[in-house]
Swiss-Prot record:
Family from the record: Belongs to the CRISPR-associated endoribonuclease Cas2 protein family.
Protein name according to UniProt: CRISPR-associated endoribonuclease Cas2 1
Gene symbol of the encoding locus: cas2-1
A GO molecular-function annotation: RNA endonuclease activity
One Pfam family cited in the UniProt record for this chain: CRISPR_Cas2
Organism: Thermodesulfovibrio yellowstonii (strain ATCC 51303 / DSM 11347 / YP87)
Quaternary structure, from the entry: Homodimer, forms a heterotetramer with a Cas1 homodimer.
Cofactor(s) this protein cannot do without: Mg(2+)
One GO biological process term: defense response to virus
Class in the EC hierarchy, top level: hydrolase
Length: 92
């Protein structure tokens, strides 16, 4: 079962920043700059955590992963759209 996670990061090095941004875009259904909405299976989450641990410098970088309860009401403002778990993902 897919669960919605918000992954936010603050990476100090431009090279590492690019690597993490490129990696997370493959799993995200939405987001903006350094915050991504990702619907993940448990194994995908484990893989993402292990990959990010290898990419970051733990003394300089910061990554937060928030599990969003599906029963919670989503409030959107402005042109924001509520996150939707897509039926299919395109990888290519």
């Amino acid at each position: 079962m897919r669960v919605l996670y918000i992954i936010a990061y603050d990476i100090t090095d431009a090279r590492r920043l690019g690597q993490i941004r490129y990696f997370l875009k493959g799993y995200s259904t939405g987001g903006q700059k350094s915050v991504y909405e990702c619907f993940l299976e448990r194994e995908e989450l484990k893989f993402i955590i292990s990959k990010i641990k290898r990419l970051i410098n733990p003394n300089e970088d910061r990554v937060h992963i928030f599990r969003i309860d599906g029963r919670s009401k989503v409030i959107t403002l402005g042109i924001a759209v509520p996150p939707i778990d897509p039926e299919y993902f395109y990888i290519g």
